[in-house]
């Protein structure tokens, strides 16, 4: 959406209520909401990104099982989780742009993930389907 986490309706409340008991995958604004709930600073992009494919560097996460270290993925956003001084006791960074911009986060204990890019977009192709499939495996206990 065109708003920030503070205007995202009940999203933050849902995250707070369920993150310890239910797997969560936040995409785009959902990713920013997760960051906000866990104390990250949300910033305004210098340039609004609308329908661009970018190289995403993937880190170690069950969400990325079976994928290469880099994928092309769709981005549509004007806000992002600021990487400057990212030192979070509950979250870790699992995906970035080449310049270090945060594109993915994961809770250190619970199966809670945020992606700034869009795995569901046709621009992300088969890699996006694999990410969503990996999340379903996590939900159904086939992967930890």
Residue ranges and their predicted role:
Residues 1-26, 38, 133, 137-140:
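Flexible gly/pro-rich beta->alpha loop and the following alpha-helix that scaffold active-site loops
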Residues 17-19, 24-25, 32-113, 117, ...:
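Pocket-forming structural segment of enzyme catalytic cores
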Residues 128-132:
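Short, charged, low-complexity patches
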